[in-house]
Amino acid sequence: MQEIEITVKGLSYSQGKSGAYALILAEKGPDARKLPVVIGGAEAQSIAVALEKSIAPPRPMTHDTWQNMLDELGTQIEKVLIHRLVNGVFYASIYARNEHGAQLIFDSRPSDAVALAVRVDCPIYVLAS
C-alpha cells in the first residue's frame, strides 16, 4: 500500500468527548485531505509544546524523556506510520534505526508517535486505503 506523507495542521478541543482533542493531520498540497484523530489532553499538550518551539517547559515532558533516551541509546526515529483503523481506534508504528544500523519498529498510539515525530522532525505517513 502507498504511504502518504501528512503534516500536523492543528489541534482542536473535541466537543463530543470531555477532555479529548482532535489532532488534525493533513496531506501536503492544495487538495489536501484531512484526518482527525481523537487524542487525550496530555498528548495534545505535548504536541502543542513541541510545535511551539518558543515554549520550554521547566521539566522534560514524557515525550521529551523518550527522545532523550533514544538519543542516548544512539537510536534515531526515521518515520511514523499510521497504518490501521479498527473499531474507531487508530494504530501507528514508529520506525527507528539503532547505532548498529538495525531497523526497529515500535507499536504506538498515533498521538505518542506524532508527539515524538514533531520533536525529532521526522516524516509522518498514513497508509492509503
Give residue ranges: language-model regions.
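Divalent-cation
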Residues: 1-129
